[in-house]
From Swiss-Prot:
Ligand binding ([4Fe-4S] cluster): 42-43, 107, 136
Top-level taxonomic group: Bacteria
UniProt KW keywords: 4Fe-4S, Cell inner membrane, Cell membrane, Iron, Iron-sulfur, Membrane, Metal-binding, NAD, Quinone, Translocase, Transport, Ubiquinone
Name of one Pfam family that matches: Oxidored_q6
Function: NDH-1 shuttles electrons from NADH, via FMN and iron-sulfur (Fe-S) centers, to quinones in the respiratory chain. The immediate electron acceptor for the enzyme in this species is believed to be ubiquinone. Couples the redox reaction to proton translocation (for every two electrons transferred, four hydrogen ions are translocated across the cytoplasmic membrane), and thus conserves the redox energy in a proton gradient.
Annotated compartments: Cell inner membrane
Cofactor note: Binds 1 [4Fe-4S] cluster.
Key word DNA damage present: no
GO biological process terms on file: aerobic respiration; electron transport coupled proton transport
Catalytic reaction annotation: a quinone + NADH + 5 H(+)(in) = a quinol + NAD(+) + 4 H(+)(out)
EC number, as in UniProt: 7.1.1.-
Protein name per Swiss-Prot or TrEMBL: NADH-quinone oxidoreductase subunit B
Length: 170
């Protein structure tokens, strides 16, 4: 038994859990992240490798989806061109709240080596980004670590106040 563990039991010796609704909702959200895989260049290959059995993102509750309406996390992997910028914004707007964005790779973060008239110099100029993954191309382990950081970030947020739900006064 752990040092500070307290075992509460109710009428008949059944264990009970003491927590808040906010923590319960955030635990559920953080452990069932459905990601929109939005691969634009080389980083998409590493993102696809992360969905294979070797890295097994399913054990963290991360499932890749093709529809933005079924996703909470958008992973943008690769170079974003100005031609794709409006489409990227539209996909982001179609995602339900709450939503998070991971910018994967140097090209998505800052435009990378493609400093041209047709390249967006960072995804954060189009949509808000929560986590930046550096590298060319980041390994699947790095993406896995970023998802674990995102899970911690989600658990720290309030489930209801972030969406504008106000407390009712009696």
């Amino acid at each position: 038994m752990a040092k500070h563990q307290v075992n509460y039991t109710a009428n008949g010796g059944l264990p009970i859990v003491l927590t808040t609704v906010d923590r319960l909702v955030q635990w559920g959200r953080s452990n069932s992240l459905w990601a929109l895989s939005y691969g634009l260049a080389c980083c998409a290959i590493e993102m696809m490798a992360s969905g294979a059995s070797r890295y097994d993102f399913d054990r963290f509750g991360t499932i890749f989806r093709a529809s933005p309406r079924h996703s909470e996390v958008m992973i943008i992997a690769g170079t974003l061109t100005k031609k794709h910028a409006e489409f990227t914004r539209r996909l982001y707007d179609q995602m339900p709240e709450p939503k998070w964005v991971i910018s994967m790779g140097s090209c998505a973060n800052t435009g990378g080596m493609f400093n041209t008239y047709s390249t967006v110099q960072g995804v954060d100029r189009i949509i808000p980004v929560d986590i930046y993954l550096p590298g060319c191309a980041p390994r699947p382990e790095t993406l896995q670590y970023a998802l674990m950081i995102l899970q911690k970030k989600i658990r720290r947020q309030s489930a209801f106040r972030a969406q504008g739900v106000k407390r009712l006064e009696a």
